[in-house]
Swiss-Prot record:
It catalyses: a UDP-3-O-[(3R)-3-hydroxyacyl]-alpha-D-glucosamine + a (3R)-hydroxyacyl-[ACP] = a UDP-2-N,3-O-bis[(3R)-3-hydroxyacyl]-alpha-D-glucosamine + holo-[ACP] + H(+); UDP-3-O-[(3R)-3-hydroxytetradecanoyl]-alpha-D-glucosamine + (3R)-hydroxytetradecanoyl-[ACP] = UDP-2-N,3-O-bis[(3R)-3-hydroxytetradecanoyl]-alpha-D-glucosamine + holo-[ACP] + H(+). It comes from the Bacteria. One of its GO terms (molecular function) is N-acyltransferase activity. One of its GO terms (biological process) is lipid A biosynthetic process. Belongs to the transferase hexapeptide repeat family. LpxD subfamily. Catalyzes the N-acylation of UDP-3-O-(hydroxytetradecanoyl)glucosamine using 3-hydroxytetradecanoyl-ACP as the acyl donor. Is involved in the biosynthesis of lipid A, a phosphorylated glycolipid that anchors the lipopolysaccharide to the outer membrane of the cell. PROSITE patterns: HEXAPEP_TRANSFERASES. The active site is at 239 (proton acceptor). Pathway: Glycolipid biosynthesis; lipid IV(A) biosynthesis; lipid IV(A) from (3R)-3-hydroxytetradecanoyl-[acyl-carrier-protein] and UDP-N-acetyl-alpha-D-glucosamine: step 3/6. Its EC number is 2.3.1.191. One of its GO terms (cellular component) is membrane. The keyword Magnesium does not apply. This is UDP-3-O-(3-hydroxymyristoyl)glucosamine N-acyltransferase.
Length: 340
C-alpha cells in the first residue's frame, strides 16, 4: 500500500487536520486492528468508546467525536464517505498489464480502442467494439457484435454473449455471465419448446456487477440495467428485467422476468421478487424479502419471520398456518359480544 503524509491525505480529502500532519500513513485498517502507522475511521458515534483502546496513528471522524480522540485526526462531515475516498487513494488492487496477451484470440473484424488490455486466453469475436482503456481479463469471452464502453473492466472469466451493450466505466467481477438465454419456453401437450431469446442486455455507465451474477437477455425487448446500478455477487436477473438508475442489489437476489425496478431502490440480500410487475422509485426491501405484488409507494418493506429459537419458531409457524381459522373464531366471538 502506498504511503502518504497525513497533511497531504487531508488535502485530497478536504479534511481538517488535528495533530501531527507529518505523520506518514502506510495503510487503512479497522479500529480494533489498526497499528500506529495506519489510519482508521469512526462513522457511528455509538462506538466512540473504542477510541480509547484504538492503536491507530490517526482517525477520520466528525467534529462531535473529536474530543474523544487521543491521536491525530481528520475531521470531516461524513467519515464513511471519506473512508471510501481514502480507500480509492490508497488502493492496492493490481493494475492490469497494458498489452494484449499472445494467447488471446481476437477476430480481425473486432475494433479495439486506444490503450485496450486483453488477458491470456480471452476470446473476442467479430464485430466487437471495445472503447479506449477497456480491460478484458484472462479467459473472458466477448460474443459477436458486443459493445463495451471506454474505461470498463472485466475481471477474469467473464462471459458476455452476442450483441450486448455495456456502458463506460463499468466493473464486472469474475464468473459473471451477461446475455445468456432467458428462461423462455412454450408448452405443447406436455413438451417444452424453446423460445429463442431475440433481445439483448443493455447496461448503462458506471455499473458494477459482482462475481458469478447472471443477467439474461430479453425475449423480444432488452434487459436493461440503468446508470450507476450496483449488483452484488450471485444474483439472478431474468429476461426483460429493467433496473432503474442508482439502484443497489445485494447478494443472492432473484428477479423474475419482466420486473421493472425504479431508481434509487435498495434490494436486501436473498430477496425474491415476482415478475411482470413494477416497484416504484426509492423503495428499500430488507433481506430475504419475498415480493409478490407491485410496490407503488416509496418506503421500507419487509417480509418473513425473523430468526427465533426453534421451539418458539415452531409455535409462530403454527400460528401463521392457522391464522385463517383464528380469524374466523375471533370474528365469531366479536359477533357474539355485539349481540349481547
Amino acid at each position: 500500500m502506498p504511503s502518504i503524509r497525513l497533511a497531504d491525505l487531508a488535502q485530497q480529502l478536504d479534511a481538517q487536520v488535528h495533530g501531527d500532519g507529518d505523520l506518514v500513513i502506510t495503510g487503512i485498517a479497522s479500529m480494533h486492528s489498526a497499528q500506529p502507522e495506519q489510519i482508521t475511521f469512526l462513522s457511528n458515534s455509538r462506538y466512540r468508546e473504542q477510541l480509547a483502546s484504538c492503536n491507530a496513528g490517526a482517525v477520520v471522524l466528525t467534529e462531535a467525536d473529536l474530543p474523544f480522540c487521543k491521536v491525530a485526526a481528520l475531521v470531516v462531515e461524513n467519515p464513511y464517505f471519506t473512508y471510501a475516498r481514502m480507500a480509492q487513494i490508497m488502493d492496492t488492487t493490481p493494475q492490469p498489464a497494458q498489452d494484449i496477451a499472445p494467447s488471446a484470440v481476437i477476430s480481425p473484424q473486432a475494433t479495439l480502442g486506444e490503450g485496450v488490455s486483453v488477458g491470456a486466453n480471452a476470446v473476442i469475436e467479430s464485430g466487437v467494439v471495445l472503447g479506449d482503456n477497456v480491460v478484458i481479463g484472462a479467459g473472458c469471452f466477448i460474443g459477436k457484435n458486443t459493445h463495451i464502453g471506454a474505461g470498463s473492466r472485466l475481471w477474469a472469466n467473464v462471459s458476455i454473449y452476442h450483441e450486448v451493450v455495456i456502458g463506460q466505466n463499468c466493473l464486472i467481477q469474475s464468473g459473471t455471465v451477461i446475455g445468456a438465454d432467458g428462461f423462455g419456453y412454450a408448452n405443447d401437450r406436455g413438451n417444452w419448446v424453446k423460445i429463442p431469446q431475440l433481445g439483448s442486455v443493455h447496461i448503462g455507465d458506471r455499473v458494477e456487477i459482482g462475481a458469478c451474477t447472471t443477467i439474461d437477455r430479453g425475449a423480444l425487448d432488452n434487459t436493461i440495467i440503468g446508470n450507476g446500478v450496483i449488483i452484488d455477487n450471485q444474483c439472478q436477473i431474468a429476461h426483460n428485467v429493467v433496473i432503474g438508475d442508482n439502484t443497489a442489489v445485494a447478494g443472492g437476489v432473484i428477479m423474475a422476468g419482466s420486473l421493472k425496478v425504479g431508481r434509487y431502490c435498495m434490494i436486501g440480500g436473498a430477496s425474491v421478487i415476482n415478475g411482470h410487475m413494477e416497484i416504484c422509485d426509492k423503495v428499500t426491501i430488507t433481506g430475504m424479502g419475498m415480493v409478490m405484488r407491485p410496490i407503488t409507494e416509496p418506503g421500507l418493506y419487509s417480509s418473513g419471520i425473523p430468526l427465533q429459537p426453534n421451539k418458539m419458531w415452531r409455535k409462530t409457524a403454527a400460528l401463521v398456518m392457522n391464522i385463517d381459522g383464528i380469524n374466523k373464531r375471533l370474528k365469531a366471538v366479536e359477533r357474539k359480544i355485539d349481540k349481547e
